[in-house]
Structures are given as structure tokens and as C-alpha cells.
């Protein structure tokens, strides 16, 4: 009887540790996805189409590594559909057009899945009529870069 209880307790401990490790890996993947999104945004703020393309490729790799149990296949495909054109061109105007859709899909994802424990600021540019996400309250507009760097305002804080 004591051996049975000991075996059950041991199996329960192993199962809990395995589940915790999976949760930790999944949370890391989600955090990486958000970080890669921020990297694309920062490249667009800097007006660097080459860097935005590279960062979009990294975003795609991260998105492709996420288990469909964590984010649905449909959501991942929507993110890939938005990020792929950014990765395939160095033309910053084209990249910024696709970034708007990517931002909308990332905002929806951030509201439904905990991507990070840190606040996520959703900002809005009235000139472009588009949103983006940031890890900083300070406005740095990815749609106009240095031409209108501070155009916009924070409209929502996610994970507050």
C-alpha cells in the first residue's frame, strides 16, 4: 500500500514538473513573438527597411515554432500572412502598409493570450488611422518614422 502511494506521488510530481516545463517553454515562445514584433516596429521607426525585413524573418521563424495548442493555426497563419510581405521587401512604404495589419492581429492576440507579464501599450496614429503595440509609453511612430516620430497617443494598456 505504501509503495503504491509512493509511486502515485512520484508520478504526480513528474507530471507536474513536465507540465510546468511545457508552460514555461510556451510562455517563452509567446514572449519571443512579442519581442520580434517590437523589433520590426523599432526598425520601421528608424526607417530601416533592410532591418525590418530581417526582423520580420525572425518573427516568422518564431511564429512557426509555436504550438497550435497555444495559438490557433488560423491566428498564426494571419500573423504569417502579414509578416511575410515585410520580410520579402526592403521598401519601407510597403512594409509599413503590412505592419498595420500585423499590429491589429498582434493586438487581438495580446488581448486573448498572455504574451508577457509586462504592460503592452497600444498606440494610435490619427494621420495613418492605424494602431501599433509598444513596450514603452513614449510615442515613436513606426508609420512615419522621423517625419512624424511623436504623432499618436496611447489608447489602451494591455496586461495592466
Where are the predicted features?
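Intrinsically disordered, low-complexity terminal tails/loops enriched in metal-binding residues
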Residues: 20-160
Amino acid at each position: 500500500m505504501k509503495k503504491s502511494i509512493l509511486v502515485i506521488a512520484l508520478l504526480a510530481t513528474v507530471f507536474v514538473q513536465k507540465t510546468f516545463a511545457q508552460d514555461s517553454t510556451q510562455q517563452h515562445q509567446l514572449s519571443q513573438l512579442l519581442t520580434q514584433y517590437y523589433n520590426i516596429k523599432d526598425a520601421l521607426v528608424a526607417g530601416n527597411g533592410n532591418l525590418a525585413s530581417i526582423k520580420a524573418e525572425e518573427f516568422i521563424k518564431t511564429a512557426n515554432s509555436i504550438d497550435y495548442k497555444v495559438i490557433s493555426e488560423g491566428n498564426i497563419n494571419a500573423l504569417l500572412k502579414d509578416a511575410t510581405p515585410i520580410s520579402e521587401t526592403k521598401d519601407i512604404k510597403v512594409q509599413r502598409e503590412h505592419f498595420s495589419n500585423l499590429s491589429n492581429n498582434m493586438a487581438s492576440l495580446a488581448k486573448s493570450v498572455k504574451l508577457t507579464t509586462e504592460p503592452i501599450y497600444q498606440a494610435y496614429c490619427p494621420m495613418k488611422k492605424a494602431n501599433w503595440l509598444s513596450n514603452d509609453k513614449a510615442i515613436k511612430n513606426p508609420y512615419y518614422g522621423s517625419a512624424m516620430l511623436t504623432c499618436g497617443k496611447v489608447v489602451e494598456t494591455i496586461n495592466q
